[in-house]
Amino acid sequence: MDPTGSQLDSDFSQQDTPCLIIEDSQPESQVLEDDSGSHFSMLSRHLPNLQTHKENPVLDVVSNPEQTAGEERGDGNSGFNEHLKENKVADPVDSSNLDTCGSISQVIEQLPQPNRTSSVLGMSVESAPAVEEEKGEELEQKEKEKEEDTSGNTTHSLGAEDTASSQLGFGVLELSQSQDVEENTVPYEVDKEQLQSVTTNSGYTRLSDVDANTAIKHEEQSNEDIPIAEQSSKDIPVTAQPSKDVHVVKEQNPPPARSEDMPFSPKASVAAMEAKEQLSAQELMESGLQIQKSPEPEVLSTQEDLFDQSNKTVSSDGCSTPSREEGGCSLASTPATTLHLLQLSGQRSLVQDSLSTNSSDLVAPSPDAFRSTPFIVPSSPTEQEGRQDKPMDTSVLSEEGGEPFQKKLQSGEPVELENPPLLPESTVSPQASTPISQSTPVFPPGSLPIPSQPQFSHDIFIPSPSLEEQSNDGKKDGDMHSSSLTVECSKTSEIEPKNSPEDLGLSLTGDSCKLMLSTSEYSQSPKMESLSSHRIDEDGENTQIEDTEPMSPVLNSKFVPAENDSILMNPAQDGEVQLSQNDDKTKGDDTDTRDDISILATGCKGREETVAEDVCIDLTCDSGSQAVPSPATRSEALSSVLDQEEAMEIKEHHPEEGSSGSEVEEIPETPCESQGEELKEENMESVPLHLSLTETQSQGLCLQKEMPKKECSEAMEVETSVISIDSPQKLAILDQELEHKEQEAWEEATSEDSSVVIVDVKEPSPRVDVSCEPLEGVEKCSDSQSWEDIAPEIEPCAENRLDTKEEKSVEYEGDLKSGTAETEPVEQDSSQPSLPLVRADDPLRLDQELQQPQTQEKTSNSLTEDSKMANAKQLSSDAEAQKLGKPSAHASQSFCESSSETPFHFTLPKEGDIIPPLTGATPPLIGHLKLEPKRHSTPIGISNYPESTIATSDVMSESMVETHDPILGSGKGDSGAAPDVDDKLCLRMKLVSPETEASEESLQFNLEKPATGERKNGSTAVAESVASPQKTMSVLSCICEARQENEARSEDPPTTPIRGNLLHFPSSQGEEEKEKLEGDHTIRQSQQPMKPISPVKDPVSPASQKMVIQGPSSPQGEAMVTDVLEDQKEGRSTNKENPSKALIERPSQNNIGIQTMECSLRVPETVSAATQTIKNVCEQGTSTVDQNFGKQDATVQTERGSGEKPVSAPGDDTESLHSQGEEEFDMPQPPHGHVLHRHMRTIREVRTLVTRVITDVYYVDGTEVERKVTEETEEPIVECQECETEVSPSQTGGSSGDLGDISSFSSKASSLHRTSSGTSLSAMHSSGSSGKGAGPLRGKTSGTEPADFALPSSRGGPGKLSPRKGVSQTGTPVCEEDGDAGLGIRQGGKAPVTPRGRGRRGRPPSRTTGTRETAVPGPLGIEDISPNLSPDDKSFSRVVPRVPDSTRRTDVGAGALRRSDSPEIPFQAAAGPSDGLDASSPGNSFVGLRVVAKWSSNGYFYSGKITRDVGAGKYKLLFDDGYECDVLGKDILLCDPIPLDTEVTALSEDEYFSAGVVKGHRKESGELYYSIEKEGQRKWYKRMAVILSLEQGNRLREQYGLGPYEAVTPLTKAADISLDNLVEGKRKRRSNVSSPATPTASSSSSTTPTRKITESPRASMGVLSGKRKLITSEEERSPAKRGRKSATVKPGAVGAGEFVSPCESGDNTGEPSALEEQRGPLPLNKTLFLGYAFLLTMATTSDKLASRSKLPDGPTGSSEEEEEFLEIPPFNKQYTESQLRAGAGYILEDFNEAQCNTAYQCLLIADQHCRTRKYFLCLASGIPCVSHVWVHDSCHANQLQNYRNYLLPAGYSLEEQRILDWQPRENPFQNLKVLLVSDQQQNFLELWSEILMTGGAASVKQHHSSAHNKDIALGVFDVVVTDPSCPASVLKCAEALQLPVVSQEWVIQCLIVGERIGFKQHPKYKHDYVSH
């Protein structure tokens, strides 16, 4: 089982299973741990699936795994390896059995892994650590002495399981517990018999062993008892037994539960021990000690035997231990197969199914119980229990299990303590329930199967349903079983020592099972049970329970913050009593559980350590369990769990949380935020929650493994994943597992488990690489994210990984100064933790916390958030922290405690902290993310993500390396870089616009890392390396900074304390943390732990962090953006910037990887992830970030993802300092030697008569150097905009002066556009473009600052927009596409120091891409924000600053590229200074630029060049096809070439235009070619053959538009379009249809040539030039006959066509003034027609004559109407268009169904019913045809009239001899297959083809009459529509086939009548009919 993945890979091909092997932070097995971590990752992925099949067993297994992990970790290499060996030797029979059942063993592993996933993952991790804590000693003693048999079997089983993972998976897993394996396999049968015999009395035996004391004694003292317990366990493993036991516990009192738990405990103990042994072996194997694995399988066997619950044992062993110990062999193997299958942690069926064959006995009881359990488990409670159990245990193992845990194992009891917390978590099931409620589906038992999918194997679904159904005893039993099983597993692990807690846990599980489960108390549940049953560990257990309970209540009760608060508030209360109460209450009722939780929390305070642990466990359980349940479930569950935890905090942030989705609602946060919230909540809940977070972290690792197994795409689950990093070993295993699974699941995980991805990514990679390294990475994460949470666990993990022994020792020493203290403190919470633990799990924990800024940061953030969210909580937390002597440290400490007790550690990185470790654990997930481009196509700084296994390593390397490298690079001192990592990698989620989505898969998430300061530290370097590509620093960075800022501002004391702590913790935990944070330390100090914390608590911390980082420098909002900026600008170069960067990077990774591990690679993958990241941040940085979040959940994320770090919500935030702060924040920022140029432009436009007063103020380094005021007047164009541009010329990098600016513009332009929001946008862009380009291009000093602002002053005109558009255009394609990549470049290259214009307020999200470059780097995120801010023009200025980033990028990337192409850039530089002037003649800078401009007639955009600036915002364009015309700036897109991933319309050889996506560019002999992908096929098209439809062009308009973007509403809306048109206003570029060559064509030519061209129907097919063809008909652009201008001029050129009147094509260009008198005024209400899209057509003279002649035929009413119409002044299409545009109506040049559908209402305006193409198309499509009188009347009344009163008749019916009224019609040609035969291509074939297709025809075949050589299969057609030119051969054939042959009149009559009519009803229907 090479941990690296050779065997693991093969065995864990799916690697979805037991990554959850508890990873102890065993210094000894650091490398092993690392590998184990990877295994765990894999196992984690698999675990969810495995877990499903066996809930209760899972618990048992988990318990044991925890023990195992704990022992393995704690004793890991020293004691536990011995144990392993001993067990192996001691239990050779079992070993042989297992060996005999090698395949079975494997199966067990695989199958159980799913079980494990839920149980093992959650339970294993939690239980194992808990067990390790409780039973660490016991296990050592007991397992060595008692578990020889069971242990041997279990271990072996697991080992065997590895081999036969696919087959025996579930059964063996269950058997894995010691009995199950045997029960399942013949080899196990020996044990099985024992076990079975015990099984029968197992539960009862346990019950009989019920004396908690006895059980505990058994476990702790009585080896025989333990063996008995083990036997009981073996028997008990029968899931039914646990269920029963659980039930009994519930029904009975805690003692029975205890007793029962105790049996489980022994089982767990053995399993745990074996798991540990396995872990050790695995670690060794990871280290290369595969030999040990062989023996360990025996131990695994024993453990499995021990954990009678196959699930339990296998979970523990297979998942937790085996995977780790055996290199994930059995676990890994199991995870792959089982994981996928056993998605639901609680899904009993999976396990049972697999298990039933192998361990029928075991399964028999178990299935029933488990069946019900699965529901519980699926609900994440079980899963959470299991998961949390596991993570917690893992944490315990990692931290407490590592060194402290070793000691604890030696001590024995301490380990158990952690389990008790697990029990509480179980008890807190409600948390899971609550989260599950979020993902309600999780609850239903049915859900369980759903999680079956590897991705959904996160048990999230199960817990709530089952838990909530706990009322039924049977169900309760089952539910409880699942929950209890999970709990019990945990309990068993820890309950061996303390059965009472287990009982409690059961009790909780039972009644408050849903609460508990809901609460995600999986881990804690067992612990709680342990607590309940074992008051000895009451302190720790109680605390844990308390925490769990708080978590539970929080999570459960709508994520009740209050509960959390109360938990936090009640920390002082007796946790133990609480626990019992909790137990009973949980039993009794959910609410009670919550109360209990509160009480527990209260008690928690007393035993902070325990609480922390409990909370950790809770979180872990929560995370683990929830994360484990299933991707979706997991997301939900995780979301639930974390969210519930977060809920307290996130409740307030929930919007952000919810942004990701319902599940994602929490999921977004859940992965990161959830953890952040967990962190926060833990903070809020004081230590308990912190511990929980740590646990979560710890569990996260497991979960991560599990999650990746499940590939729970849900980032939320990832949160658990975050916990994954809980133990280095686990991480290693997880890492590896993730690696293996990464490819398959990474993307998925990333996308679905974005959090998980991060967790696994960040930690596993390093972990996989080196135990120490991952730990260091974790540490980094910790550091960078201030993931003290993670730090303790992750630090142990990371440090252990990196410096496995050294770090671990250091960490453990620092973390838990008393080696055992780590776990022990939890146990000894009351004693040791009482004061330190109050705040920090224990002094060590505190130290660890201190040592781990991440914990501190988390704490700080948490505190900040707490203080913001719940001051009371915070106070409680603070009080505890103060007890520790560090108020802020309290949270930090809590995290630290968690860290100290692994659980807390993992928990802390909820958002950021966990992320680093998670990254380690998650990399595979990220890899999966990459594999499945999901949301962030661009791996966030995780170039390795794509590689599954390597991705883990690499991701770890990259992410973690970013985290880790800086840390490593800096040498442990660089650990300080961890915070840097936080800063380093910023996952920014940009608004997802079509462009963004199209342009870069990862565009959504930008992993930004501060370009400037990022590299200052080693961490920075790492961050940059990671973020550089994507510059996602901003999201996390922003979050971190914001958080820091928040903390600094909102929670200075905590922040300061945190800082102090940070400073302190280097002292206390300084060894590790100092090493880790040395570099980071300063950063932290400088940033205030906030920075590191901020990643952890990104939500609050973003601002807080920013504040901390740039708190003094800028406001909170600014802080967020400034995180990067500050890093870059503020020159927080090394320290602050690094932390910021690290934070950012971590957060970005975190975003991707659930934010749990900021370091986790950028998990840009998912919006959810990003959202989660932000949410997580929100959670952590509730106040600041929350605001930010609220404003721009996605945006902020995006922005942050962009590396803008704009906490968009706060406004343009730091980048532009909100524009206002821009000066101060921008001005001071030029430390990079960039001259800070800032340009503030205020443009006021008066509608109608536009009088534009443009004031340009240029600042250089804050000094006003120039002020210009220009006044412009334009014809009615409605736009108003104010824009400020901060330009740092240097920032742009001086691409080419103007060019750079433009490039800047492109990014900035987009930003500006956005900022400007509509009309203003363009000007803004101009200013922003140039100015902003300049401003944003802080680096771009090229050109005068003013020059830089080559904002064409005429912002209305393209001039203004021009610069920005130009920039946009030149840089845009690159920018947009490279947004992410460019982002990194720009940010990295351009010293994002300059504030990025965040103001793109006006830009719609789609502009995101546009801002794309700008926003992408930082602006993208901002752009995202912009869209949100879009309406505010003020934001605009912010946008400018932000733009610089983009500009920077653009400059670097496309900017220079494009700009160089276009002269516009230089002009811009020149024009910049005279922006105002530029505005008037923006053309100056754009002349000669290659652009894509809109042909006014048909609305299509064609490539061409600007030949000169005509003024008034218009430019003369020479199109490539030879046409020339004046085009408004807004209709000019400065995007040549068209950006990649942009949807375009390409002219195929068949002369049909069809949509495609640009996938590449190439130049040959000066000619540009586009690689267009259509329907999966790519083809090269010439530049001229690629055009943009109106819709496609509008998407780019915001970003690349030369003129102000005027769409007020989303671009997709007709209203927006109309606004744009409005801007054009006078110019009337549409000049309607020039008279088309054919009347038909003319009337409809302008619209679309044919149906095929529908996308770009404007051009008639007739026009040969590809684009022209689209617009051939009536478009100005169409051929000369149409004469663009002439056509426009022609008022009503009449075409010859009978059906189509040329008028349609011709625009009546009457003098508006003259017309106004007749037509009515322009609407005073500028939004009169907003939302309406209009098609205008005009009756031809023939139509008028015909209608008049037929009036008599029609009803008098009709004639009267007709007369009325005649009385009305002549219809002037042009003037009517101007009226409609003036009222914000959108004019469709040609019929376009898509555009019509996007409008609120689409109307055809005509003077009368006519037979034009547009009219027919509207009849065919059901678009109402309205008289132009409606427009006239509406304008007169200045309010919309009811158009139904102005409906035009459909036409004259030949059959009825009258004019028929228009009526809504269904497709008249539904499913009709038509053959068109004619010699007129455009006016007949294409025209009628389009009309028929619009009318619903199934297919229309065009056949040219002259094409005699073509054979036509007439048999497939229903009708032939032709004209006299129809060849005789066709007629003959049709006649033979009895095919009706009709003329186009038949088609027309069908349209008029509204239904298909007879083919021979009228003579005119004959194709050869000759009109009279």
Curated annotation (Swiss-Prot):
Stated consequence of mutating S25A: In 28A: Defects in recruitment to double strand breaks (DSBs), abolished interaction with RIF1 and abolished ability to repair DSBs
Impact after mutating D1616A: Does not affect recruitment to double strand breaks
Effect annotated for changing T670A: Decreased interaction with TOPBP1
Stated consequence of mutating R1396K: No detectable effect on methylation by PRMT1 (in vitro)
Annotated segments matching region Disordered: 24-273, 290-332, 346-507, 520-556, 568-595, 649-687, 742-911, 997-1028, 1045-1103, 1127-1148, 1188-1232, 1269-1478, 1622-1719, 1745-1768
Compartments it resides in: Nucleus; Chromosome; Chromosome, Centromere, Kinetochore
Compositional bias ranges of the Polar residues kind: 94-121, 151-168, 195-205, 300-322, 346-361, 426-441, 481-490, 520-531, 849-864, 890-902, 1018-1028, 1188-1200
Modified residues (Phosphothreonine): T302, T543, T548, T670, T855, T922, T1056, T1214, T1372, T1609, T1638, T1648
Feature: compositional bias, Basic and acidic residues: 82-91, 138-149, 491-501, 582-595, 798-816, 839-848, 1071-1083, 1127-1139
Segments of this protein annotated with the region Tudor-like: 1484-1603
Omega-N-methylarginine modified-residue sites: R1355
Reported impact of S105A: In 28A: Defects in recruitment to double strand breaks (DSBs), abolished interaction with RIF1 and abolished ability to repair DSBs
Record note on what altering S523A does: In 28A: Defects in recruitment to double strand breaks (DSBs), abolished interaction with RIF1 and abolished ability to repair DSBs
Consequence of changing S437A: In 28A: Defects in recruitment to double strand breaks (DSBs), abolished interaction with RIF1 and abolished ability to repair DSBs
Covalent cross-link site, Glycyl lysine isopeptide (Lys-Gly) (interchain with G-Cter in SUMO1): K217, K868, K1434, K1563
PANTHER family, A to Z: TP53-BINDING PROTEIN 1, TUMOR SUPPRESSOR P53-BINDING PROTEIN 1
Disease: A chromosomal aberration involving TP53BP1 is found in a form of myeloproliferative disorder chronic with eosinophilia. Translocation t(5;15)(q33;q22) with PDGFRB creating a TP53BP1-PDGFRB fusion protein.
Known function: Double-strand break (DSB) repair protein involved in response to DNA damage, telomere dynamics and class-switch recombination (CSR) during antibody genesis. Plays a key role in the repair of double-strand DNA breaks (DSBs) in response to DNA damage by promoting non-homologous end joining (NHEJ)-mediated repair of DSBs and specifically counteracting the function of the homologous recombination (HR) repair protein BRCA1. In response to DSBs, phosphorylation by ATM promotes interaction with RIF1 and dissociation from NUDT16L1/TIRR, leading to recruitment to DSBs sites.
Designated name of the protein: TP53-binding protein 1
Organism for this UniProt entry: Homo sapiens
